[in-house]
Structures are given as C-alpha cells and as structure tokens.
C-alpha cells in the first residue's frame, strides 16, 4: 500500500490535488456551446437532401391536364420571325407576283398612247410574260402549229440581244429580267394575231396588213416602256427597230 501511495503521488503533478476531483462540474453552464457533439456524417446529410427532393417531386398537381398553369413564352427568334402561319406573308408576295402591277402593265401595252410608269415597268416580273408565252404557243397549237420550241428559243435570243443593245445605249443600264419582262408583256398583241390565224388563214393581203399592224403595235409599246424606264429621251425609234425585227419573227410563225 505504501508503494501504491507513492506511485499515485509521483504520477500526478505537484500542483494537482486529488481532492479537486470531488468538486462537481456543471456541463450545462456553458449553454448550447458545450452540448454533446456528434461526428460528421456526410451520408446522413445527403439522405436528407434526397428525401427533401422526393417530397417536392411528390407534391400533387393542382392544375388541369389540358390547361397547364405555366404559359409558353416564345424565344427571341420566334418573336422576330413569327411562330405561326398567320404571321407569314402570302405566298404570292414571297414569289414577287403582284396582280395589280400585272394589270397595269397589261393596260400599258394595250394602250400604246398611254404614258408608261417607269417605276412599275422597271420591276422584274416574269409571271405575266410566262403566261403570255404559253398563251401564244397554245393559240399556235390550235392553228395546227406545234412551235413551242421556236417560241422559247426566239424569245431567249431576242431578250439577250436587246439586253446587250440597251446596256450599250442607256446610261443607267438595265437588268436581263427587266428586258425579258417588258418584251414578254408586249407579246400580248401577237396573241391576237395568232387567234385570228385559228379562225381564218392569214396568207393573203389581209393577213399581211394585220401582221404589219400587230408588229408596229408590239414594237411601239416595247420601245415606249424602255424609253420611260431607262430615261432614253429621243431614242424611241432606235429602240423600236430591233423590237420590230424580233416581233416580226413571231408574226412569220403565226402567218405561215
């Protein structure tokens, strides 16, 4: 026992007293700061987040199936270009077909003495010329003349020649589409000549006189439109001569 007392005395520090152990210590004196701490468990917190997300996902749907509560907001692209077919322009407008301008150009050709509107005639409109070319070929077909290839070939060569000639004569220049449009619209009187060829034969004095009048009508209308669109004052006769040569070929196809 004496050895044990010596051991205890040697083990503790000299300033430490065993009697101090009898004094009680209040763990609650420090408040929540000295409360019991548990070790960190990352899986427990992760499980809490998962349960919270599951509770949020399992909330009942308060809206209706066919009437969702959240409205659709279009993107910036859809706001600019439109998201429905109602916002799109008409198909004829996208193709560049304007029936008002087609009618005005047709009236300009049918009235040779009428002043042509250069702003309208300077447009590239090939819808009317294509219709008139098909109508001219159809009337020739009714007369027993299958000349669609000649009509298209002569039209292409004539438009190309007039395009080169007008670019040399005018100061502003002209596009190939504008030349084709004007020459195609001025083909309308030639359809009248081919229609007469269906009713009676044009191989005579009456046919020659009628063909000459139609050629003068077509060439005068075309030259008037070119002069108005290209501001070529005083050069109408110079423009009318090659136009008369072109429409003379169509007249020969209609008569013979």
Curated annotation (Swiss-Prot):
Pfam families: Yip1
TM region(s), chain numbering: 126-146, 148-168, 173-193, 196-216, 236-256
Stretches assigned to the Lumenal side: 147, 194-195
Any GO BP: regulation of ER to Golgi vesicle-mediated transport
InterPro entries (UniProt xref): Yip1/4-like, Yip1_dom
Coiled-coil annotated spans: none
Keywords (A to Z) from UniProt: Endoplasmic reticulum, ER-Golgi transport, Golgi apparatus, Membrane, Protein transport, Transmembrane, Transmembrane helix, Transport
Any one GO CC term of the record: trans-Golgi network
Main location: endoplasmic reticulum
Signal peptide start and end residues: none
Membrane topology term: Multi-pass membrane protein
Localization in the cell: Endoplasmic reticulum membrane; Golgi apparatus, cis-Golgi network membrane
Cytoplasmic side: 1-125, 169-172, 217-235
Function noted in UniProt: Plays a role in transport between endoplasmic reticulum and Golgi.
Family: Belongs to the YIP1 family.
Protein name: Protein YIPF5
